[in-house]
A protein has these predicted regions:
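N-terminal membrane-targeting/pre-transmembrane regions
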Residues: 1-66
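Core segments of transmembrane alpha-helices
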Residues: 21, 79-83
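Cytosolic juxtamembrane regulatory segments of multi-pass membrane proteins
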Residues: 54-55, 109-128
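Individual transmembrane alpha-helix segments
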Residues: 62-80
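Conserved beta-hairpin
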Residues: 82-113, 120
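Hydrophobic residues embedded in beta-strands of well-ordered beta-sheets
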Residues: 106-107, 130-132
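Canonical phosphoinositide-binding patch of PH/PH-like domains
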Residues: 133-157
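Structured, soluble extracytoplasmic/luminal domains of envelope-associated proteins
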Residues: 161-163
């Protein structure tokens, strides 16, 4: 039985993106919750703007600058950690998809199907995206060759069954 396996290149790229988003989120979060609140407003202005605050800038304006920059770091932390979460969930979803096939049929979501159970094979996205959609009575599956190794072999098997 041939089992679809997670594409290594897909996995590496998504793990890299996950790491980048997580590190950036941690960095922004550290700035928002630790570094910026502990830094005096004038020193924070100087570290961000690379120049001392103007002489006519009041303490209230410096405090407003600090509050705005802290809020910005907080928002950036939420956005990047949210992106990391979305990448992780997508990766888990793709990794959790199980599909295997042999000469007699295939197993989809733990249920065995015969090749004759396939009622429709949609290859409209194959040339552009290497996506194959198969369906039958009460079930369907979208198989992406970018996500899983073995989809091309499955496509050839479906063609040989002339469905």
């Amino acid at each position: 039985m041939t089992t679809l396996k997670l594409n290594r290149e897909f996995l590496v790229r998504h793990l890299f993106a996950l790491a980048v988003f997580a590190v950036l989120g941690g960095w922004f979060g550290f700035d928002a919750f630790v570094r910026y609140p502990r830094t005096p407003a004038a020193a924070l202005y100087e570290s961000i703007e690379k120049a001392p605050p103007p002489a006519d800038m009041s303490q209230a304006k410096l405090d407003a600058f600090k509050a705005q920059k802290t809020k910005t770091q907080f928002v950036l932390a939420i956005v990047t950690l949210g992106a990391a979460l979305l990448v992780a969930l997508h990766l888990l979803s793709v990794a959790g998809f199980k599909f295997a096939f042999d000469d007699d049929g295939f197993v989809l979501r733990g249920k065995r199907f015969a090749w004759g159970d396939v009622k429709n094979v949609d290859e409209s996205l194959w040339e552009k995206k290497s996506v194959l959609r198969i369906s039958g009575d009460g079930w369907d599956a979208t198989l992406d060759a970018w996500h899983h190794v073995g989809v091309k072999e499955l496509r050839e098997r479906l063609k040989s069954k002339s469905l």
